[in-house]
Amino acid sequence: MSLANISFCELKRKEVINLRDGARLGAVCDMEIDRCTGTVCSIVVPGPPKLWGLLKSDEELVIPFCKISNIGDDVILVDLVL
């Protein structure tokens, strides 16, 4: 599945997994788009929760589009060195 034929609503339902260590990074919460070209620059996932998971993190993990390896039916695979 390519990003050319996927809606943001579908993208938000997918879990992001890092290929390097198998870590679950969370679900897509936002994306950044280049205003001039209209292309997707990056996807954004929320950072790790605070206070035993009770509070949302102030940090976000911005994943450049070039780091996306594959977009499957249920997950997005990324290749990140964290």
Predicted regions and their residues:
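Peripheral interaction segments used for macromolecular assembly
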Residues: 1-82
